[in-house]
From Swiss-Prot:
Origin superkingdom: Viruses
Alphabetical list of Pfam families matching this protein: TT_ORF2-like (PF02957), TT_ORF2a (PF08197)
Record protein name field: Uncharacterized ORF2 protein
InterPro entries tied to this protein: Hepatitis_TTV_Orf2a, HEV_TT_vir_Orf2/Gyrovir_Vp2_N
Positions of the UniProt region annotated as Disordered: 1-21, 149-202
Amino acid sequence: MAEFSTPVRSGEATEGDLRVPRAGAEGEFTHRSQGAIRARDWPGYGQGSEKSMFIGRHYRKKRALSLCAVRTTKKACKLLIVMWTPPRNDQHYLNWQWYSSILSSHAAMCGCPDAVAHFNHLASVLRAPQNPPPPGPQRNLPLRRLPALPAAPEAPGDRAPWPMAGGAEGEDGGAGGDADHGGAAGGPEDADLLDAVAAAET
């Protein structure tokens, strides 16, 4: 009985061709068969074309984005302007609402009964800024003279009184000098010294 072969189209892979997928022991495709399929479907596969061909999400270099240049859109600004309305209540009611909001915020974080004292304590501890100065040119504060420092107390007997002092104190001082050292003009020690100098000159 004659055997007829199946006609093969031009360009179709045959069994002897290396590009025909080969099945493994269980009939699954092996890595070699997958490579053959890619080589058949993508001409030039395995010759460096897969490096240049990238099918996926395009990435760009990450750069620091400055938020200072981001501005609020005109639509958002217009919406805020349209939504805001001036208060319609009187001054007394507005003050009460503000005071109630402060008490409520204090009760949300602390259980002490006096919110005002707590707030004043925080202001003193945290050194809250004082009231701003009135507008206008800054005034220089006047300089105030300080009183002179008192003289240091002297212990009696530290030094002899000045012999040439005038007045009653000078007289007393001179008398004291005469009593101690033999007169205001000089004592016996001074006379001996003068005699020794005169003898040396002659």
